[in-house]
């Protein structure tokens, strides 16, 4: 867990799902939320995505098999992105320049040529913003998150190694003079570049509304410095530009307006409207 404080702005980063779950389950409620109605433990499954905080925690820790099956069906039909190529010098029977010593020895592959090969093993960091406001429907949250899943799948298919983070930004409701002051930005590593794409593991943090409405809100309920101004509504969501400013890597906005089928390469992803 890495904490950075800049005045009233606090940035907290967790290196893994395990580290984050350990923190929110072992840290007591803060003074502001100790006697408040908690989103993390509220009843009702549709808006929250799960029936309880315990169910949400288990799905985050152990995977979401039911959604995994549905996602795998969608991802099987996923078209590949255009591969990223690099130019490599090779020896061939044809080329643009002879290698005289090899030619004199009668070696067939005595010409210098260039060959395009798919670029492999480039590591990139993707930050998925899940800072949705309370009026965002469960269906919309799931649709937007599935778009992100498709993008990650395409990148991995193309040969990129992806560090994937889920991010929340929330601010104190502005005062009459427009001052928001208190802000919290949370980033959780849900997939490291050295891990293969595990659909079951990523299904919950990327797709289930409980990731925000129970799990991430639980962080707000326990983080010690959160003030009472967050109790009713958990603050208001930071925008994608805030996320891009606070965290290194490529930001996937909360709402991806671009047609996913038109995203053909990494530059298209970097160019998503923020």
Where are these predicted regions, by residue range?
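Acidic, low-complexity intrinsically disordered regions
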Residues: 1-125, 130-146, 150-274
């Amino acid at each position: 867990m890495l904490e950075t404080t800049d005045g009233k702005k606090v940035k907290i980063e967790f290196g893994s799902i395990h580290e984050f779950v350990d923190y929110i389950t072992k840290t007591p409620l803060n003074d502001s939320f100790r006697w408040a109605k908690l989103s993390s433990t509220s009843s009702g499954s549709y808006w929250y995505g799960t029936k309880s905080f315990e169910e949400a925690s288990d799905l985050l820790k152990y995977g979401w098999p039911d959604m995994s099956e549905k996602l795998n069906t969608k991802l099987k039909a996923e078209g590949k992105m255009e591969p990223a190529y690099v130019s490599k010098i090779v020896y061939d029977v044809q080329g643009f320049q002879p290698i005289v010593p090899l030619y004199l020895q009668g070696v067939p592959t005595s010409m210098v040529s260039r060959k395009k090969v798919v670029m492999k093993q480039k590591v990139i960091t993707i930050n998925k913003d899940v800072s949705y406001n309370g009026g965002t429907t469960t269906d919309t949250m799931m649709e937007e998150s599935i778009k992100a899943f498709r993008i990650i799948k395409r990148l991995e298919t193309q040969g990129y190694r992806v560090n994937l983070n889920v991010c929340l930004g929330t601010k104190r409701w502005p005062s009459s003079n427009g001052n928001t002051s208190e802000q919290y930005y949370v980033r959780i590593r849900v997939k490291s570049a050295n891990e293969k794409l595990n659909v079951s593991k990523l299904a919950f943090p990327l797709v289930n509304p409980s990731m925000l409405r129970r799990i991430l809100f639980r962080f707000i309920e326990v983080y010690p410095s959160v003030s009472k101004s967050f109790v009713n509504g958990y603050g208001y969501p930071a925008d994608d530009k805030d996320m891009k400013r606070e965290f290194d890597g490529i930001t996937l906005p909360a709402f991806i307006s671009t047609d996913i089928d038109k995203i053909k390469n990494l530059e298209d992803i970097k160019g998503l409207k923020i």
